[in-house]
Amino acid sequence: MRPSELTQLKQDGRAISILTAWDGISAALVEAAGADVVLVGDSLAMVALCHATTLPVTVEQMLHHTKAVGRGFTRPLPQQPLVVCDLPFLSYQCGEDKAVAAAGSLLKHSCAAAVKLEGAEPEVLAVIERLVRMGIPVMGHLGLTPQAVHQLGYRRQAEDPRSQAQMLQQAKQLEQAGCFALVVEHVPSSIARCLSQQLTIPVIGIGAGEDCDGQVRVTADLLGLTPSQPPFSQPLIQGRQLCVEALQGWVKQLHQQAKTATTTTSPPEPDC
């Protein structure tokens, strides 16, 4: 899967599926599920590294996990999902050169074929244009942007006409800057539908209604592996509970075997 193929999927009216992965096991599961895109999201800071936000994760950690994702795939390269890696907090907000170095490292040394950036500030748009000129595909991200949690929080975005008009303008700027797709998170379905209709590039929703060109979800949320999930990403199974019950069964069985062994007559010790 290549970035340009996602636009063709939009034109064909076929929904685009994006799931996150953070190691080899999760990558193998997502690949087997048939997802179009694997996102190595900075959400791994919370899912895999137990941080409270996405902010602490570094470029080096993103590279480490993206390499693991690549090793988890089992299909030949042409049949593998497109891998998009998040550029973490402060890896692209501090200048174009730093952003190029971070994105270039991810594409050179891992299976990533594209990067994702949050926001549409003038500085971010300049970074996107620079990356695209250098041959690095970029996915945009508007709405609830976790890297701006201390400024915006985790609340729903673009709920009034003024902010919706601003989001539409930003989305068009991201498309003009060269983004091949756009994620919109935790926004009203009406604005997501408007973006999908007015943009040529695919609009991928998460908590943005069903009228987008595709959907993205955190795999651990869908599997019920996280302690809690956002309202727009309810689990399909109670994976955490199932795993705990399976492991408890193993521990219980082992303890019972040990108890049985201590109550039976032990054979005489061999002479050494």
Swiss-Prot record:
GO CC annotation: cytoplasm
Secretion signal span: none
Catalytic activity: 3-methyl-2-oxobutanoate + (6R)-5,10-methylene-5,6,7,8-tetrahydrofolate + H2O = 2-dehydropantoate + (6S)-5,6,7,8-tetrahydrofolate
Pathway(s) served: Cofactor biosynthesis; (R)-pantothenate biosynthesis; (R)-pantoate from 3-methyl-2-oxobutanoate: step 1/2
Amino-acid positions noted as binding 3-methyl-2-oxobutanoate in the UniProt annotation, renumbered to this chain: D42, S43, D86, K116
Cofactor note: Binds 1 Mg(2+) ion per subunit.
Bridged cysteine pairs (disulfide): none
Gene Ontology biological-process entries: pantothenate biosynthetic process
Keyword Metal-binding: yes
Pfam families: Pantoate_transf
UniProt-recorded Gene Ontology molecular function terms: 3-methyl-2-oxobutanoate hydroxymethyltransferase activity; magnesium ion binding
Annotated residues for binding of Mg(2+): D42, D86, E118
Chief place where the protein resides: cytoplasm
Protein's UniProt name: 3-methyl-2-oxobutanoate hydroxymethyltransferase
Organism annotation: Prochlorococcus marinus (strain MIT 9313)
